[in-house]
Each structure stands twice: as C-alpha cells, then as structure tokens.
Design a protein with these regions (language model features):
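Extracellular ligand-binding/catalytic regions of CAZymes and related secreted enzymes
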Residues: 73, 94-95, 155-156, 161-183
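Conserved beta-strand scaffold positions in the cores of enzyme catalytic domains, especially
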Residues: 20-22, 74, 136-137, 157-159
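An acidic, glycine-rich "communication" segment
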Residues: 77-155, 164
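Helical hinge/lid and interdomain linker segments adjacent to catalytic or ligand-binding clefts
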Residues: 1-88
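A structural signal for well-ordered alpha-helical scaffolds and beta->alpha junctions
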Residues: 5-6, 109, 122, 174, ...
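Short, surface-exposed beta-strand/loop "edge" segments at domain boundaries and coil↔beta transitions
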Residues: 9-10, 144-146, 166-170
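Short, charged, surface-exposed secondary-structure boundary motifs
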Residues: 32-35, 50-51, 105-109, 169-170
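Conserved hydrophobic/aromatic beta-strand scaffold that supports enzyme active sites
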Residues: 38, 147-149, 159
Length: 183
C-alpha cells in the first residue's frame, strides 16, 4: 500500500488473512521496495490534507507501468480533489469529485467487479470518471463510469471511485492468479 502513515484500511488485510505493508510513493522503483502482487493507492492519495503520497507518482510512471506489465495489479482509489488527471498511468483517466450513493451497474463481467462482491447497495462514491480509454466495468445510476480496468501485459490497473472497503473476493482472486513483481 502506498501511503505515508498508518491507516485503518490496513486492518482489513489482517482480517482477510493477507500480508500488507506500507511504503512511500517516493520509494517506487528503488531496490528497497519488496516485490508484491497488488499495489494499492487508497482514497485521498492526491489530497495534501491527508497525505503526501501523490507527490512521488509523477516520476514513478515507468516503474508502475513495468509492475503492471510484468503481472502486478495496481488498485487505485479516488484522489479526493475536485478534478484529477492520472497522468502517471499508462492510459487516459480523468476524475471529477462528486459525492453520491448508487447501485453500481455492471458493464459486462470482469474479475475487478469482485471488489464490491457481497456489499449491499447503495454504495458510496466520491466521484466518477469523466473520460478514459480503459474498459469501464461499473457505472453509477446515471451511467457514469465508477470503475475502469486496463489490462497491460500480464497485469492490470483497476481504478475506482467507490468509497467502500473492498471485498475479500477481489484480493483472493488477484493473489491467486498473479505472482509477486518488483515495483
């Protein structure tokens, strides 16, 4: 998990029986960061009121793309700023902040949708994606993208604006079907 101080979110992984360690975004691409299967950017990563995590992302674009290409899963939650372009991702993605509740509407079927498996609607969202060239796999009640997936090489990037704790099924699936990759 990329973050600069302890988060309640970390306890979720202990509850799921999964290993979780926290790292600074500035450590991406260095020899000090251990290999992992899933790399998570929690909600608020670009909001300076919460963290400095967003600072290291721009210069880490190549490391993140290499991680995904080799088989890693990058799970990205909302930046929690009014508007945000994910310029460090290897695809186009633009976020607009707008808190709302919704019953997510699946678009096709994708393993990433397991992120909300067994979570009763309505779900909280803190925005939507105004544009993307990734595959939209969930939309809100107004038809706006709230989860997008881009498969790159052997891995994938999952970006979502859903503001709920992720379901265990998503991590079980990603841990089972991926290998540890150096970031």
């Amino acid at each position: 998990m990329l973050w600069d101080n302890p988060l309640l979110f970390e306890k979720l992984f202990v509850e799921y029986g999964l290993e979780c360690s926290r790292a600074l975004s500035t450590s991406l691409g260095t020899p000090y960061l251990p290999a992992c299967k899933v790399l998570i950017l929690p909600t608020g990563f670009a909001n300076k009121q919460y963290t400095k995590t967003g600072i290291g992302l721009g210069r880490s674009k190549h490391s993140l793309e290499k991680f995904v290409t080799k088989g890693g899963t990058l799970l990205v939650f909302s930046p929690l700023v009014p508007e945000y372009e994910y310029e460090w991702l290897p695809f186009s993605l633009k976020y607009i902040m707008e808190e709302h509740s919704c019953t997510p509407q699946p678009v096709g079927k994708h393993d990433a949708q397991k992120l909300i498996e067994n979570i009763d609607p309505p779900l909280g969202c803190d925005g939507y994606f105004a544009e993307t060239d990734a595959d939209v796999v969930l939309k809100d009640d107004r038809g706006r993208p709230i989860m997008a997936v881009k498969e790159i090489g052997k891995g994938m990037v999952v970006a979502t604006t859903i503001h709920e704790l992720p379901a265990a099924g998503f991590f079980e699936c990603r841990v089972a079907c991926t290998k540890k990759v150096k970031v």
